[in-house]
A protein has these predicted regions:
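Surface-exposed ligand/attachment interfaces on beta-rich extracellular proteins
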Residues: 77-88
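Solvent-exposed loop/turn segments at secondary-structure junctions
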Residues: 3-4, 12-13, 40-44, 48, ...
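Cysteine-nucleophile protease catalytic domains, especially the papain-like/related folds used
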Residues: 2-77
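Short, well-ordered alpha-helical scaffold segments within catalytic/effector domains
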Residues: 58, 82-83, 113
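Loop/turn elements at helix/coil->beta-strand transitions in domains of secreted/extracellular proteins
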Residues: 60, 65-73, 90-97, 131-133, ...
Length: 164
């Protein structure tokens, strides 16, 4: 076995995008460097599950990128807006979307972090003047893009990390 940490997978997506020499290190080396720079830690009940505090995403990624010779601008925000993600994507930059929901099995909050690579505006059939705003994300489990409703009503909290 190994360990999985969604925030680290999301940051690996960003590192690959911003670092022209990304492939000079192994994926494992990159994973553990980002793990260390972000202060990620193991779940005390499940050593295969890692956690990263949201407020360590930008500082840890910036530190990692500096070791790769890349200067990067970052900012973060609790409850980020749609326009922040849209503007960042329109400027060809990556960001992270972090969201909490209530796990129906345990009744406890569960969180997930995903890299954001774009967005779309969807118009439901038969609903004039309605628009659903979705983020194009890598969910960390699949190899293809997923589309996430930005205004999903069951998020308990959201957090954004923006790079440029």
């Amino acid at each position: 076995g190994g360990v999985y940490a969604c925030a680290i997978v999301a940051l690996i997506d960003c590192a690959e995008y911003y670092d022209p020499s990304f492939y000079s290190d192994s994926l494992g080396t990159t994973f553990w460097r980002l793990w260390n720079y972000t202060g990620s830690y193991y779940d005390s009940n499940n050593s295969a599950q890692g956690y990263t505090n949201n407020d360590k995403l930008c500082s840890g990624f910036k530190q990692y990128m500096s070791t790769r010779g890349q200067a990067i601008q970052t900012y973060e925000q609790s409850a980020p807006t749609w326009m922040q993600y849209k503007t960042n994507a329109d400027n060809w930059n990556m960001s992270l979307f972090c969201a909490g929901i209530i796990d129906t099995t345990t009744g406890m909050r569960s969180g997930h972090t995903m890299s954001v690579q774009g967005y779309a505006l969807l118009e439901p059939i038969g609903v004039p003047n309605e628009e659903i705003k979705v983020l194009g994300v890598h969910d960390g489990w699949n190899t293809y893009a997923r589309y996430l409703n930005f205004y999903f009503s069951n998020y308990t909290d959201t957090y954004g990390a923006f790079f440029g």
